[in-house]
Amino acid sequence: MPSNKKVSRSKLVKKLDTVFSQYIRLKNSVDEMATCFTCGKVDHWKKLQNGHFQSRKHYSTRWDEVNCQVQCAGCNVFKYGEQYKFSVNLDAKYGEGTAERLSIKAQQIIKLSNFEIEDMIKIYKNFVDSM
């Protein structure tokens, strides 16, 4: 018998974070190997992380595909995301001013409904399953 329990918002956000992280790492991998956006370390996509230029606390950029790039644990955790290198590499890859635009976008307040979060989970899960 299916449960009619409503899934909590925090569980939905966590699920979206997980599937979006997989998507970013798979999207940027070749033969299951990916390169750290800031230091260039190459490793299996499962051993790398989804690094954010603008903090995950900003919902407007938390699931932004430009704001999120593959990073090794050394850069993402121990070197606090290597923000300067991250910004330089963003501008090199996506065009001058990209890092500044993301900084501005991060300050915009957005409110996602649970339905919108569930929809994003489905979209990114489909991408991950097809990769």
Language-model region placement:
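Short Fe-S-cluster ligation motifs
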Residues: E65-F78, G97-D119
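A boundary/linker detector
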Residues: M1-Y23, S103-M131
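Short Cys/His-rich Zn2+-coordinating modules
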Residues: K14-L26, N50-H58
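Short Cys/His-centered divalent metal-binding micro-motifs
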Residues: G40, H44, C68-G95
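Histidine-centered nuclease catalytic patch
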Residues: T35-N67
